[in-house]
UniProtKB/Swiss-Prot annotation:
<keyword id="KW-0472">Membrane</keyword>
<keyword id="KW-0496">Mitochondrion</keyword>
<feature type="binding site">
    <location>
        <position position="201"/>
    </location>
    <ligand>
        <name>a ubiquinone</name>
    </ligand>
</feature>
<comment type="similarity">
    <text>Belongs to the cytochrome b family.</text>
</comment>
<feature type="transmembrane region" description="Helical">
    <location>
        <begin position="288"/>
        <end position="308"/>
    </location>
</feature>
<keyword id="KW-1133">Transmembrane helix</keyword>
<dbReference type="InterPro" id="IPR027387">
    <property type="entry name" value="Cytb/b6-like_sf"/>
</dbReference>
<feature type="binding site" description="axial binding residue">
    <location>
        <position position="97"/>
    </location>
    <ligand>
        <name>heme b b566</name>
    </ligand>
</feature>
<dbReference type="GO" id="GO:0045275">
    <property type="term" value="C:respiratory chain complex III"/>
</dbReference>
<comment type="function">
    <text>Component of the ubiquinol-cytochrome c reductase complex (complex III or cytochrome b-c1 complex) that is part of the mitochondrial respiratory chain. The b-c1 complex mediates electron transfer from ubiquinol to cytochrome c. Contributes to the generation of a proton gradient across the mitochondrial membrane that is then used for ATP synthesis.</text>
</comment>
<dbReference type="InterPro" id="IPR005797">
    <property type="entry name" value="Cyt_b/b6_N"/>
</dbReference>
<feature type="binding site" description="axial binding residue">
    <location>
        <position position="182"/>
    </location>
    <ligand>
        <name>heme b b562</name>
    </ligand>
</feature>
<feature type="binding site" description="axial binding residue">
    <location>
        <position position="83"/>
    </location>
    <ligand>
        <name>heme b b562</name>
    </ligand>
</feature>
<keyword id="KW-0812">Transmembrane</keyword>
<feature type="transmembrane region" description="Helical">
    <location>
        <begin position="113"/>
        <end position="133"/>
    </location>
</feature>
<dbReference type="InterPro" id="IPR016174">
    <property type="entry name" value="Di-haem_cyt_TM"/>
</dbReference>
<keyword id="KW-0830">Ubiquinone</keyword>
Length: 379
């Protein structure tokens, strides 16, 4: 008699995805982040669901409903802070996951990679809308500034912004629709993640060496289920340390002030995980140019496979490319720092130099280093 997990139509899909899946024998801890992103998504959907039971998406009551959740709802404070800091953990895992893809050449699976980029945009949109919902000062002004960027689009810009706002400014209609979108998007992300996995399982996983590992595969369970559980425990440890000891560490104090359209905060900035893109946006004096640079800062990942000149897939044995990769990481950290600073000297200049370096690494330096490494190996 065949095992039910191999014969039942539904169990068979789960079995082929998480149990009997052939996996390379040498994948490192950098391959944990995919499953951690799945866990983060589940945590966010569950905590978000419980928050939505008590939240009201009305400009008059949104702020006080969040206060009510923290003060009066049983364990409401911990649900709220797990959700807020869970978003930060989500983005940490996301950046690590993308970084691993760039370092080890996983972008050569173009379908999986492109779905991943689409997922990244969707997650960023969801996080942005979620930041608006508590209706604090930074929520309101963040929504105003970021949506206003669309007005830079020629001809249709102003109409598009007013259409998104549902009026002539960020108001009740905006908050209501942002709540609706924030609720539905995680389910769209879940569907996209399933497609992401579908394409990945067509090719099989990459591995640190970048060499095809078809001749050396091991079953996903128990080897990588155990390995993923270790990553999961570390994720939960870091998340709970954040939630229980310093829940507001990554937030903005201005968001504890109710939204006031008549009073602009001294320095409007998004959450920390958007600061690198925000710094790139601000480094260009022209509004349309800034918006294009903002979009391209993520979209540039789509042309990484096209600009891959090396005959080796992974950077594991390419010291020159490794130096450029870590320069890129340092550059992103610099941009994140600059995004949180006021627009004044010397931060403007540092931001502009860091932005130029960011695009140069992807468009010029990485392809050149690939060609040089090929020559050094006489390929």
């Amino acid at each position: 008699m065949t095992n039910i997990r191999k014969s039942h139509p539904l169990a068979k899909i789960i079995n082929e995805s998480f149990i009997d899946l052939p996996a390379p024998s040498n994948i490192s801890a950098w391959w944990n982040f995919g499953s951690l992103l799945g866990v983060c998504l589940i945590i966010q959907i569950l905590t978000g669901l419980f928050l939505a039971m008590h939240y009201t998406s009305d400009t008059m009551t949104a702020f006080s409903s969040v206060t009510h959740i923290c003060r009066d709802v049983n364990y409401g404070w911990i649900i709220r802070y797990i959700h807020a800091n869970g978003a930060s953990m989500f983005f940490i895992c996301l950046f690590m996951h993308v970084g691993r893809g760039v370092y080890y050449g996983s972008f050569t699976f173009t379908e999986t990679w492109n779905i991943g980029i689409l997922l990244m945009f969707t997650v960023m949109a969801t996080a942005f809308m979620g930041y608006v919902l508590p209706w604090g000062q930074m929520s309101f002004w963040g929504a105003t500034v970021i949506t206003n960027l669309l007005s830079a689009i020629p001809y249709v810009g102003t109409n598009l912004v007013e259409w998104i706002w549902g009026g002539f400014s960020v108001d009740k209609a905006t908050l209501t629709r942002f709540f609706a979108f924030h609720f539905i998007l995680p389910f769209i992300i879940s569907a996209l993640a399933a497609v992401h996995l579908l394409f990945l399982h067509e090719t099989g996983s990459n591995n640190p060496s970048g060499v095809v590992s078809d001749s050396d595969k091991i079953p996903f369970h128990p080897y990588y289920t155990i390995k993923d559980i270790l990553g999961l425990l570390l994720l939960i440890l870091v998340l709970m340390l954040l939630v229980l000891f310093s829940p507001d560490l990554l937030g903005d104090p201005n968001n504890y002030i109710p939204a006031n359209p008549l009073n602009t905060p001294p320095h409007i900035k998004p959450e920390w995980y958007f600061l690198f893109a925000y710094a790139i946006l601000r480094s260009i004096p022209n509004k349309l140019g800034g918006v294009l640079a903002l979009v391209l800062s993520i979209l540039i990942l789509a042309i990484v496979p096209l600009l891959h000149t090396s005959k080796q897939r992974s950077m594991m044995f390419r010291p020159l490319s490794q130096c450029l990769f870590w320069l890129l990481v340092a550059d992103l950290l610099t941009l994140t720092w600059i995004g949180g600073q006021p627009v004044e000297h010397p931060f403007i200049t540092i931001g502009q130099l860091a932005s130029i370096l960011y695009f140069s690494i992807f468009l010029i330096l990485m392809p050149i280093s690939g060609i040089i490494e090929n020559r050094l190996l006489k390929w």
